[in-house]
Amino acid sequence: MNRLLICQNITKHYQEGSLQTQVLKEVSFSMQEGELIAIVGSSGSGKSTLLHMLGGLDQPTSGEVFIHGQSLQRATQDELAKLRNQYLGFVYQFHHLMADFTALENVMMPMLISHKNKTEAKDRAENILSAVGLAKRILHKPSALSGGERQRVAIARSLVNNPKLVLADEPTGNLDHKTTESIFELIQKLNQEQKIAFLLVTHDLQLAEKLGRRLVMQDGILRESNS
Protein backbone atom coordinates (compact mmCIF):
# COMPACT_ATOMS: atom_id res chain seq x y z
CA MET A 1 0.00 0.00 0.00
CA ASN A 2 1.37 3.41 -0.97
CA ARG A 3 1.85 6.32 1.38
CA LEU A 4 -0.57 9.05 0.39
CA LEU A 5 0.52 11.68 2.91
CA ILE A 6 3.79 12.22 4.74
CA CYS A 7 4.15 14.87 7.43
CA GLN A 8 7.77 15.51 8.45
CA ASN A 9 8.69 17.51 11.56
CA ILE A 10 5.99 20.16 11.14
CA THR A 11 6.47 23.07 13.52
CA LYS A 12 4.32 26.20 13.57
CA HIS A 13 4.96 29.46 15.43
CA TYR A 14 2.74 32.52 15.49
CA GLN A 15 4.35 35.86 16.27
CA GLU A 16 2.39 38.71 17.88
CA GLY A 17 4.73 41.57 18.67
CA SER A 18 7.37 40.21 21.00
CA LEU A 19 5.21 37.20 21.92
CA GLN A 20 5.85 33.93 20.09
CA THR A 21 3.37 31.06 20.42
CA GLN A 22 4.33 27.56 19.32
CA VAL A 23 1.21 25.72 18.12
CA LEU A 24 2.76 22.61 16.53
CA LYS A 25 5.93 20.89 17.74
CA GLU A 26 7.78 18.70 15.22
CA VAL A 27 4.69 16.74 14.16
CA SER A 28 5.48 13.66 12.07
CA PHE A 29 3.24 10.86 10.77
CA SER A 30 2.24 9.24 7.49
CA MET A 31 -1.01 8.00 6.00
CA GLN A 32 -1.69 5.19 3.55
CA GLU A 33 -4.05 5.31 0.59
CA GLY A 34 -7.58 4.41 1.70
CA GLU A 35 -6.76 4.81 5.41
CA LEU A 36 -9.22 6.26 7.93
CA ILE A 37 -7.66 8.28 10.76
CA ALA A 38 -9.12 10.37 13.57
CA ILE A 39 -7.11 13.10 15.29
CA VAL A 40 -8.52 13.84 18.73
CA GLY A 41 -7.65 16.49 21.27
CA SER A 42 -9.07 19.35 23.26
CA SER A 43 -9.90 22.74 21.79
CA GLY A 44 -6.75 24.76 21.14
CA SER A 45 -4.45 21.72 21.04
CA GLY A 46 -3.38 22.40 17.43
CA LYS A 47 -5.63 19.97 15.51
CA SER A 48 -7.15 22.47 13.09
CA THR A 49 -3.81 24.22 12.56
CA LEU A 50 -2.28 20.89 11.54
CA LEU A 51 -5.12 20.23 9.10
CA HIS A 52 -4.49 23.62 7.47
CA MET A 53 -0.82 22.67 7.00
CA LEU A 54 -1.74 19.29 5.50
CA GLY A 55 -4.14 20.93 3.06
CA GLY A 56 -1.67 23.58 1.97
CA LEU A 57 -3.93 26.32 3.35
CA ASP A 58 -1.14 27.62 5.60
CA GLN A 59 2.62 27.14 5.65
CA PRO A 60 4.58 25.68 8.59
CA THR A 61 7.44 27.53 10.22
CA SER A 62 9.56 24.47 9.50
CA GLY A 63 9.04 20.94 8.24
CA GLU A 64 7.49 19.54 5.10
CA VAL A 65 4.27 17.89 3.91
CA PHE A 66 4.15 15.51 0.94
CA ILE A 67 0.95 14.56 -0.89
CA HIS A 68 1.44 11.61 -3.25
CA GLY A 69 5.19 12.27 -3.15
CA GLN A 70 4.91 15.97 -3.99
CA SER A 71 6.08 18.59 -1.51
CA LEU A 72 3.58 21.31 -0.62
CA GLN A 73 6.40 23.57 0.52
CA ARG A 74 8.31 23.39 -2.77
CA ALA A 75 5.23 23.88 -4.96
CA THR A 76 4.29 27.16 -6.63
CA GLN A 77 0.83 28.60 -5.94
CA ASP A 78 -0.44 27.18 -9.24
CA GLU A 79 1.05 23.76 -8.48
CA LEU A 80 -0.45 23.88 -4.98
CA ALA A 81 -3.91 24.64 -6.36
CA LYS A 82 -3.55 21.77 -8.83
CA LEU A 83 -2.48 19.39 -6.04
CA ARG A 84 -5.49 20.36 -3.92
CA ASN A 85 -7.90 19.94 -6.83
CA GLN A 86 -6.42 16.60 -7.83
CA TYR A 87 -5.93 14.90 -4.47
CA LEU A 88 -7.79 16.69 -1.67
CA GLY A 89 -11.33 17.33 -0.50
CA PHE A 90 -12.26 19.52 2.48
CA VAL A 91 -15.14 19.38 4.99
CA TYR A 92 -15.56 21.87 7.82
CA GLN A 93 -17.66 22.22 10.97
CA PHE A 94 -19.76 24.83 9.17
CA HIS A 95 -20.98 23.56 5.83
CA HIS A 96 -20.28 26.81 3.89
CA LEU A 97 -22.95 25.99 1.31
CA MET A 98 -24.13 28.76 -1.00
CA ALA A 99 -27.61 29.71 0.17
CA ASP A 100 -29.04 30.63 -3.24
CA PHE A 101 -28.00 27.38 -4.89
CA THR A 102 -29.58 23.93 -4.68
CA ALA A 103 -27.78 20.95 -3.18
CA LEU A 104 -27.04 19.77 -6.72
CA GLU A 105 -25.60 23.13 -7.78
CA ASN A 106 -23.47 23.36 -4.62
CA VAL A 107 -21.96 19.95 -5.29
CA MET A 108 -21.37 20.70 -8.98
CA MET A 109 -19.49 23.91 -8.21
CA PRO A 110 -15.95 22.48 -7.64
CA MET A 111 -16.11 20.68 -10.98
CA LEU A 112 -17.33 23.79 -12.79
CA ILE A 113 -14.54 25.84 -11.18
CA SER A 114 -12.12 23.21 -12.53
CA HIS A 115 -13.62 23.84 -16.00
CA LYS A 116 -15.25 20.42 -16.24
CA ASN A 117 -18.13 19.84 -18.65
CA LYS A 118 -21.48 20.91 -17.13
CA THR A 119 -23.25 17.68 -18.08
CA GLU A 120 -20.41 15.63 -16.62
CA ALA A 121 -20.51 17.75 -13.44
CA LYS A 122 -24.28 17.29 -13.10
CA ASP A 123 -24.08 13.52 -13.55
CA ARG A 124 -21.21 13.20 -11.08
CA ALA A 125 -22.95 15.43 -8.49
CA GLU A 126 -26.19 13.44 -8.77
CA ASN A 127 -24.32 10.17 -8.25
CA ILE A 128 -22.44 11.49 -5.22
CA LEU A 129 -25.59 12.96 -3.65
CA SER A 130 -27.27 9.59 -4.13
CA ALA A 131 -24.29 7.88 -2.46
CA VAL A 132 -24.68 10.10 0.63
CA GLY A 133 -28.42 9.39 0.83
CA LEU A 134 -29.80 12.60 -0.68
CA ALA A 135 -31.13 11.43 -4.06
CA LYS A 136 -34.55 12.93 -3.30
CA ARG A 137 -33.20 16.23 -1.93
CA ILE A 138 -30.93 17.40 -4.74
CA LEU A 139 -33.12 20.32 -5.81
CA HIS A 140 -33.57 21.70 -2.29
CA LYS A 141 -31.66 24.78 -1.16
CA PRO A 142 -29.73 24.66 2.14
CA SER A 143 -32.50 26.48 4.03
CA ALA A 144 -34.85 23.57 3.26
CA LEU A 145 -32.41 20.95 4.54
CA SER A 146 -31.73 19.74 8.08
CA GLY A 147 -28.33 20.22 9.71
CA GLY A 148 -27.37 16.64 8.97
CA GLU A 149 -28.51 16.93 5.36
CA ARG A 150 -26.51 20.12 4.86
CA GLN A 151 -23.39 18.40 6.15
CA ARG A 152 -24.03 15.47 3.82
CA VAL A 153 -24.15 17.95 0.93
CA ALA A 154 -20.83 19.38 2.14
CA ILE A 155 -19.33 15.88 2.20
CA ALA A 156 -20.67 15.21 -1.30
CA ARG A 157 -19.12 18.47 -2.50
CA SER A 158 -15.75 17.40 -1.07
CA LEU A 159 -15.95 14.15 -3.06
CA VAL A 160 -17.10 15.45 -6.42
CA ASN A 161 -13.58 15.86 -7.87
CA ASN A 162 -12.79 12.27 -6.83
CA PRO A 163 -10.10 13.11 -4.25
CA LYS A 164 -7.70 10.58 -2.76
CA LEU A 165 -7.94 12.21 0.68
CA VAL A 166 -10.65 14.17 2.49
CA LEU A 167 -9.56 16.45 5.35
CA ALA A 168 -12.50 16.91 7.71
CA ASP A 169 -12.30 19.52 10.50
CA GLU A 170 -14.91 18.82 13.21
CA PRO A 171 -17.51 17.86 10.58
CA THR A 172 -20.07 16.95 13.25
CA GLY A 173 -19.34 19.74 15.73
CA ASN A 174 -22.73 21.44 15.30
CA LEU A 175 -24.87 18.29 15.10
CA ASP A 176 -26.81 16.31 17.69
CA HIS A 177 -25.57 12.87 18.74
CA LYS A 178 -27.85 10.84 16.48
CA THR A 179 -26.98 12.92 13.41
CA THR A 180 -23.30 12.80 14.36
CA GLU A 181 -23.39 9.00 14.41
CA SER A 182 -25.04 8.92 10.98
CA ILE A 183 -22.32 11.19 9.53
CA PHE A 184 -19.58 8.99 11.00
CA GLU A 185 -21.28 5.91 9.54
CA LEU A 186 -21.42 7.66 6.16
CA ILE A 187 -17.69 8.46 6.30
CA GLN A 188 -16.91 4.84 7.16
CA LYS A 189 -19.12 3.64 4.30
CA LEU A 190 -17.45 5.94 1.77
CA ASN A 191 -14.05 4.88 3.04
CA GLN A 192 -14.83 1.18 2.71
CA GLU A 193 -16.75 1.25 -0.58
CA GLN A 194 -14.88 3.95 -2.51
CA LYS A 195 -11.45 3.57 -0.83
CA ILE A 196 -11.30 7.31 -0.09
CA ALA A 197 -8.89 8.17 2.71
CA PHE A 198 -10.29 10.38 5.48
CA LEU A 199 -8.35 12.36 8.08
CA LEU A 200 -10.93 13.43 10.62
CA VAL A 201 -10.35 16.00 13.34
CA THR A 202 -12.78 15.64 16.24
CA HIS A 203 -13.11 16.18 19.97
CA ASP A 204 -15.63 13.30 20.23
CA LEU A 205 -13.56 10.48 21.74
CA GLN A 206 -16.45 8.02 21.79
CA LEU A 207 -16.99 8.22 18.06
CA ALA A 208 -13.29 8.41 17.25
CA GLU A 209 -12.84 5.04 18.97
CA LYS A 210 -14.93 3.48 16.19
CA LEU A 211 -12.38 4.46 13.56
CA GLY A 212 -9.39 2.35 12.57
CA ARG A 213 -6.52 4.55 13.75
CA ARG A 214 -6.45 7.37 16.28
CA LEU A 215 -3.85 10.07 16.84
CA VAL A 216 -3.93 12.31 19.90
CA MET A 217 -2.95 15.98 19.76
CA GLN A 218 -1.95 17.60 23.05
CA ASP A 219 -0.19 20.95 23.38
CA GLY A 220 0.98 20.81 19.77
CA ILE A 221 2.46 17.31 20.07
CA LEU A 222 0.95 14.43 18.07
CA ARG A 223 1.19 10.81 19.22
CA GLU A 224 -0.45 7.49 18.46
CA SER A 225 -3.32 6.51 20.74
CA ASN A 226 -2.64 3.46 22.89
CA SER A 227 -6.31 2.80 23.60
From Swiss-Prot:
Q: Which InterPro entries match?
A: AAA+_ATPase, ABC_transporter-like_ATP-bd, ABC_transporter-like_CS, ABC_transpr_LolD-like, LolD_lipo_ATP-bd, MacB-like_ATP-bd, P-loop_NTPase
Q: Which organism is it from?
A: Histophilus somni (strain 129Pt) (Haemophilus somnus)
* Primary localisation category: membrane
Q: Can you say what this protein is called?
A: Lipoprotein-releasing system ATP-binding protein LolD
Q: What is its EC number?
A: 7.6.2.-
Q: Give a short account of what the protein does.
A: Part of the ABC transporter complex LolCDE involved in the translocation of mature outer membrane-directed lipoproteins, from the inner membrane to the periplasmic chaperone, LolA. Responsible for the formation of the LolA-lipoprotein complex in an ATP-dependent manner.
Instruction: Report the locations given in the UniProt record.
Output: Cell inner membrane
Q: Which GO terms describe its molecular function?
A: ATP binding; ATP hydrolysis activity; transmembrane transporter activity
Keywords annotated in UniProt: ATP-binding, Cell inner membrane, Cell membrane, Membrane, Nucleotide-binding, Translocase, Transport
**Gene3D superfamilies, alphabetized:** P-loop containing nucleotide triphosphate hydrolases (3.40.50.300)
Q: Where does ATP bind?
A: G41, S42, S43, G44, S45, G46, K47, S48
- Per the database record, which ranges form the ABC transporter domain? 5-227
Q: What class of enzyme is it?
A: translocase
Q: How does it assemble?
A: The complex is composed of two ATP-binding proteins (LolD) and two transmembrane proteins (LolC and LolE).
Which Gene Ontology terms describe the biological processes this protein takes part in? lipoprotein localization to outer membrane; protein localization to outer membrane
